């Protein structure tokens, strides 16, 4: 995972050049922002609730908020690099991990077709 933003965001709010600059920026959070803040502290970023102006339990909504230039998003490199409008923010820092859970109802996992899709998604999300 890395931070990504579109040109519109960078033009409006400026480019963060070091970890300390990130506290002056807005982010969109997927899921529980407190948990994400905890993971980000592990990579040296001191962010708080005020930095997360937007939050959603839908990654599509998170993506659109960032794509419209309203916030920086945390994205998987494999996905973000397929969209030229997104550029890495603080590209020099090492990619970091945030646990991602891929879940399905137990009944769906017994279907061979669903299991195949599930396994393909798991491989793609893990970077295999």
Predicted regions and their residues:
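A late-sequence structural motif
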Residues: 92-128
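C-terminal regulatory
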Residues: 2-100, 127-128
């Amino acid at each position: 995972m890395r931070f990504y933003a579109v040109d519109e965001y960078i033009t409006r709010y400026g480019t963060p050049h070091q970890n300390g600059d990130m506290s002056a920026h807005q982010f969109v959070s997927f899921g529980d922002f407190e948990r994400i803040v905890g993971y980000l502290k592990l990579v040296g970023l001191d962010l708080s609730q005020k930095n997360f102006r937007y939050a959603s339990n839908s990654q599509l909504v998170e993506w659109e908020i960032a794509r419209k230039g309203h916030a920086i998003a945390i994205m998987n490199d494999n996905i973000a690099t397929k969209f030229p409008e997104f550029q890495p923010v603080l590209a020099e820092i090492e990619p970091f991990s945030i646990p991602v859970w891929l879940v399905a109802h137990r009944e769906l996992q017994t279907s061979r077709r669903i299991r195949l899709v599930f396994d393909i998604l798991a491989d793609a999300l893990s970077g295999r």
